């Protein structure tokens, strides 16, 4: 009976720690606070653009260059469940569907603070359970029973601590201004204006990640210095231009969106 009480005491913080993100029913208008996420992946969806008089401006990224309204901008719907997000291109028959992984922890500092809070709770629970064992030993003098329970308690406590410390260890940032060559396709799908994606000579720039990308003229659009951050399940890049502008995406997200193909059919990417 005492062992069951101790196990329950140790399990409560772990159960409280787990949570699910809020579902989102199918809609063509994502919440404004989520536009940055959706428009990082589905940057051709109409909900990302404000089009007036044939000129379209990006709603999520205000410093994105205006583009001409064209067939590249498609009607889309989005849908979210606990462990995945989906967007549909409804302008095409049959509908094209893309599955992404939803951001679980946008604010990493808050996530780490939560983990440390549960570590403290587990520590206090360990002390409390130790007091219960001591009282039980004094009352019943059953040393063998107390030793079994103590071993069980220590093992449970260590496993819980290892799980949480491992979570923190995995969150260490890997930061650099130039991503590894093998990751260029991922970073240049999302951070296409970062200067590490382009090789510029004599005013002509070629894309390093996508060899079949048409050459473009050197201009301010591709002169941004970017810092990349690579976590186990999330990547972000910061565009350094007057002030830091951070964009977050999932590292495991497929990179073969070929965002430029349809756009280049209608206009220069400028």
UniProtKB/Swiss-Prot annotation:
Induction: Expressed in the immediate early phase of the viral replicative cycle.
Bilayer topology annotation: Multi-pass membrane protein
B repeat start-end pairs: 147-270
TM helices/strands, residue ranges: 118-138, 146-166
Cellular component aspect of the GO annotation: membrane
N-terminal signal peptide: 1-26
Keyword Transmembrane helix on entry: yes
InterPro entries the record matches: ASFV_fam_110
Residues annotated as glycosylated: 75
Family label: Belongs to the asfivirus MGF 110 family.
Chain's role: Plays a role in virus cell tropism, and may be required for efficient virus replication in macrophages.
Name recorded for this polypeptide: Protein MGF 110-1L
Protein source organism: African swine fever virus (strain Badajoz 1971 Vero-adapted) (Ba71V)
């Amino acid at each position: 009976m005492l062992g069951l009480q101790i196990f329950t005491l140790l399990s409560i913080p772990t159960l409280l720690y787990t949570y699910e993100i809020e579902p989102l029913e199918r809609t063509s208008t994502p919440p404004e606070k989520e536009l940055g996420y959706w428009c990082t992946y589905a940057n051709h969806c109409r909900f990302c653009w404000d089009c007036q008089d044939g000129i379209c401006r990006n709603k999520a990224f205000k410093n994105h260059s205006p583009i001409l309204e064209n067939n590249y901008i498609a009607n889309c719907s989005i849908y979210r469940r606990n462990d995945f997000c989906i967007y549909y291109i409804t302008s095409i028959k049959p509908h094209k569907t893309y599955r992404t992984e939803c951001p679980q922890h946008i604010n990493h500092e808050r996530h780490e603070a939560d983990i440390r809070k549960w570590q403290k709770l587990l520590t206090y629970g360990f002390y409390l359970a130790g007091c219960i064992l001591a009282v039980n030993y004094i009352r019943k003098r059953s040393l063998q029973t107390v030793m079994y329970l103590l071993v069980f308690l220590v093992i449970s406590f260590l496993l819980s601590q290892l799980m949480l410390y491992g979570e923190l260890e995995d969150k260490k940032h890997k930061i650099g201004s130039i991503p590894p060559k093998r990751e260029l396709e991922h970073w240049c799908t999302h951070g296409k204006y970062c200067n590490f994606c382009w090789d510029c000579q004599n005013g002509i720039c070629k894309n390093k990640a996508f060899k079949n990308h048409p050459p473009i003229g050197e201009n301010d659009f591709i002169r941004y210095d970017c810092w990349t951050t690579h976590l186990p399940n999330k990547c972000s890049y910061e565009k350094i231009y007057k002030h830091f502008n951070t964009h977050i995406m999932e590292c495991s997200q497929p990179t073969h969106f070929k965002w430029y193909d349809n756009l280049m059919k209608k206009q220069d990417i400028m």
